[in-house]
Amino acid sequence: MQCSHLLSYREEAKRVLFGGSMFVPDIPSLQRWLELAWSKGFDVSGALHFDNRICGSKRWIGTTECAALLRSFGLKARIVDFAPKKSKSMYLSVPGSAIAPKVKSYGPMDRYVVKKGGSGKGKAVDSHSSNSSRISKGAVLMEWVWNYFSDNRLNVSSGVHMTNKGPLYFQHEGHSRTIVGIQRRLLGTTFTPQYNLLILDPADFTRAIEKALIEKRGWEGYLKRGAHTLTCPEYQMLYVDNGIADGEELEKLKTIDSHFVEF
């Protein structure tokens, strides 16, 4: 979805992404593009992890591989890690990982996650929970997402804020989803914010989601996820800044770094 959005809404991306082909390649072709990115020196440590070969395999890839692929075209892909404070030194000790000095800080995310199955899906109800630590962790991530989508708003209509911000690649425990928006309600006299992420999950059936959205019935069960569903110990996000890097800036993008946000 990141690539589809870039091709649809970013003029500068259309010219460089996948050789200016104007379409998203199939998986085998994406694997070849990733190997080409590695051969150009993007994410050297990540390439070594895969022995510089990914074509034809079914090996698990994640946020850093997506960043390497996008950066190889000059796109400014940024990674944000959400994790407990005790994990911070571990992230920074990983070759190629560092606190990005100029990454815009919207709020809370994770770099190397446990590579195991799990859809991360949760029941679509409001974010109430007796587990205060879980809600606190979720609130940090939710606030980051809210601030991200609130930046550079285009217009407001009936309480809906339109933005030109791209979707967020959302990684956790071997599964990736796409955050396309966020809801906020202000509760009580203290106007306490309550959030729900709007998430597209590749594990869901596209036709079912499309039907629910057209009929405006049942779509919440597919898209809405409250803070109580954020139960993983770590999370990772990727977004793409505007502009195309070249020269020295492009060389710096070869090293995959991340902005660490503490839960």
List each language-model region with its residue ranges:
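Generic preference for well-ordered alpha-helical elements
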Residues: 10, 27, 60-67, 106, ...
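Active-site nucleophile-adjacent alpha helix/oxyanion-hole segment immediately C-terminal to the catalytic cysteine
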Residues: 1-57, 67-72
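Short capping loops/turns at secondary-structure boundaries
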Residues: 55-59, 63, 138, 172
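Intrinsically disordered, low-complexity regions enriched in proline, serine, glycine
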Residues: 8-20, 25-27, 46, 78-82, ...
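Cys-His-centered catalytic/binding microenvironment captured across papain-like cysteine peptidases
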Residues: 161-166, 172-174, 183-263
